[in-house]
Design a protein with these regions (language model features):
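Glycine/serine-rich anion-binding loops at beta->alpha junctions
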Residues: 77-116
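Short beta-strand segments
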Residues: 109, 143, 151-154, 184, ...
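Active-site-proximal beta-alpha loop/turn segments in soluble metabolic enzymes
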Residues: 42-45, 123, 161-170, 199-208, ...
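Well-ordered secondary-structure scaffolds
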Residues: 5, 10, 17, 173-176, ...
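Alpha-helix C-terminal capping segments
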Residues: 47-48, 93-105, 187-192, 227-228, ...
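A glycine-rich helix N-cap at a beta->alpha junction
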Residues: 123-149, 219-225, 229
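Acidic, glycine/proline-rich low-complexity segments that act as flexible tails and inter-domain linkers
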Residues: 1-88, 260, 307-314, 428-430, ...
Length: 434
């Protein structure tokens, strides 16, 4: 089998066999297929696409290119959530305690933030003492005993995806549905959960900017996940505005605590209840109505907040900061950003707001940058609000006052003003089950 023949076959619109796809993934992973041939192959897929079967085989081959996590000891109870990334997305911090307090087993590997999107691991590391690295035995033992463990991603999960993603990033082949699907799903399948709920973010702060593109991705990932033998549901949620009012790391832990204590932002709470209910539907077999009721009661009874404390304590975190969020890292400068004009906020570009937060120190430009856990933004008004000139729109938190002017400029670029009340937007666009 020669790689050049397979590139030619796909270039001419042919359908690759299972063996041909596995040959490509194996050869690229071990280095026998060079970058220039894999780049050419990625471009042929970009233009010619793949069938669902080809995409499923590609996903499976990438999943098995490195280590996989065996969660079979937890049976149907093992469940995971994956977000396609957004701004202010602290849902894992809220959903994990809800689901694990009701019998779900969440053995979760999460990523770090890059660019305008935040990462769950960075948020958790803003809790003093929290350990994001555990041995395999300690990881499994904690899931067994507590019901949840969240750590950073392992070094040798899906090495084929790591190599291919880096190549796609510099060859203009990121926006290919089969390649996006196989990239996301290979990582999720390698992480071992029996059931997976995908939070597909759609809008200005998301990878998928339009509902049409978001729906295509959601449907593709659900089909491929099911073809690979897992229970998969996708929730399509709105990321045209940041989720909740807090953007940053310690700031988002604070907001997660507010939700679990029953007095959080209604929009954020609503999205988390929807995600948790779908996870409980898959792992416990409950009807959605019952799962929703149980998730709501886990918050109102305090059960989910107590579970959060058990989880954080098990990984070495200082639980005192959950009981008193003022003990979390706080920025030395808290600057009130004022509205330059009166009117209705018609649109907030979530990506730009995420970029503003990153400028303050809450995010990274490159993967080696060090973040400031205290930096970020607290929104005081959101899309739909009527404001007067000089009213506080947001509070910028930073330990680097020299970044304020740049961060303020980018934040104000994110806002589109209007004279009348804007149309309300849905929080959830829909749920894909097949």
């Amino acid at each position: 089998m020669r790689m050049v023949d397979l590139i030619e076959k796909k270039r001419d619109g042919g359908v690759l066999t299972d063996d041909e796809i596995r040959f490509i993934v194996r050869g690229f992973t071990d280095g026998s297929i060079p970058d220039y041939q894999m780049s050419a192959f990625a471009m042929t897929v970009f233009y010619k696409g793949m069938t669902d079967h080809e995409t499923a085989v590609l996903t499976d081959a990438m999943m098995h290119s490195g280590d996989t996590v065996d969660l079979s000891r937890f049976g149907d109870k093992s469940v995971d959530k994956h977000s396609t990334g957004g701004v202010g997305d602290k849902t894992t911090l809220i959903v994990a305690p809800i689901v694990s307090s009701l019998g779900g087993k969440m053995a979760k590997m999460s990523g770090r933030g890059l660019g305008h999107t935040g990462g769950t691991v960075d948020k958790l590391e803003s809790i003093p003492g929290y350990q994001t690295t555990l041995s395999a035995d300690a990881f499994m033992r904690q899931v067994e005993q507590v019901g949840v463990a969240v750590i950073g991603q392992s070094g040798n999960l899906t090495p084929a995806d790591k190599k291919l993603y880096a190549l796609r990033d510099v060859t203009a082949t990121i926006d290919s549905l089969p390649l996006i699907t196989s990239s996301i799903m290979s990582k999720k399948l390698a992480a071992g959960a029996h059931s997976i709920v995908l939070d597909v973010k759609i809008g200005s702060g998301a990878f998928m900017k339009t509902l049409e593109d978001g729906q295509k991705l959601a449907e593709s990932m659900v089909r491929i996940g099911r073809a690979c033998g897992r229970n998969v549901v996708a929730v399509m949620s709105n990321m045209d505005i940041p989720l909740g009012f807090y953007i940053g790391n310690a700031l988002e832990v604070r907001e997660a605590v507010e939700v679990l204590q029953g007095h959080g932002c209604p929009d954020l709470t609503g999205v988390c209840i929807t995600l948790a209910a779908n996870m409980l539907h898959l792992c416990n077999g409950w009807p959605i109505e019952e799962a929703t009721k149980q998730a709501q009661e886990a918050i109102s009874s305090g059960r989910a907040f107590e579970q959060m404390k058990r989880w954080i304590a098990a990984q070495g975190g200082d639980v005192a900061v959950l009981d008193n969020v003022d003990l979390l890292p706080q920025a030395s400068v808290q600057y009130e950003l004022k509205a330059p004009q009166a009117g209705y906020i018609h649109h907030m570009d979530a990506q730009k707001i995420g970029e503003s937060s990153a400028i303050l120190g809450a995010g990274r430009k490159t993967k080696d940058d060090v973040i400031d856990p205290a930096a970020g933004i607290v929104l005081k008004e959101k899309t739909g609000a009527k404001v007067v000139q000089g009213q506080t729109l947001a509070v910028l938190h930073t330990d680097r006052p020299e970044t304020l002017a740049d961060a303020e400029r980018v934040f104000l670029e994110a806002i589109r003003w209007g004279a009348d009340v804007p149309a309300a937007q849905p929080l959830i666009y829909g749920i894909v089950t097949e």
